[in-house]
């Protein structure tokens, strides 16, 4: 059942890591409840910086991120953590931490100041473990798991946090194709349950198949946006990536299939460093 939760509004956002050197340059977007919004673009274009700025991880230099007219950056840390959860690109768990303990950390914004997990907390943790198919791993240490298992554990922690807004930076990292699709199907179910989901992906076809809205970035700016069939065009892919690609309609889904054919004629190519 879809929620009537207000959208997440990003307005003329500028953000970076050094004063006067913005990585994100005046971006505006709206992410709706019940939908998956995906940010894509070449390495270094500002996707992760934008995602961090949509939580309290990174304060913008200008602009706003708001829900129902209230700026996320004006909330307390606890208030923001009850509204927005974020899975960064390379999360690190303390050595020896058990899976169940890590997932339970998602309940931190909701826990009483003193005492253990409440019944509501325990139910949220159990539900998240079941949904991500890691219930059989709860007594294992996180560092004993494969990369794909760890990624599902981190997502379980985010789901246990039970926020209306979920931000995911490359959630299919370390996953083989079958597990990547399973992960994206799980993410889609969060949107179908009424959540606002914003994620960063690199796989163009997966982004097309599992997103409701696409924002394609280059050099800190959005150069194309809309539903996948609208956002992905050969000209846009050439501009964003220097890529010659064909965009095919997929009669079985709402998103197109992107078929790379090489570098575009205008591309300067990618300079790779020699291996030492």
Model-derived regions: residue spans:
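ABC ATPase nucleotide-binding domains
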Residues: 240-276
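The feature captures the beta-strand-to-loop junction immediately N-terminal to the Walker
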Residues: 40-42
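Conserved ABC transporter NBD signature motif
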Residues: 63-71, 80
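A short, flexible loop at the N-terminus of ABC-type nucleotide-binding domains that lies
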Residues: 1-10, 14-26, 33, 74-76, ...
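Catalytic Walker B motif of ABC-type/P-loop ATPase nucleotide-binding domains
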Residues: 166-170
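Conserved ABC ATPase signature
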Residues: 116, 141-145
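Helix-to-loop junction immediately C-terminal to a conserved catalytic motif
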Residues: 55
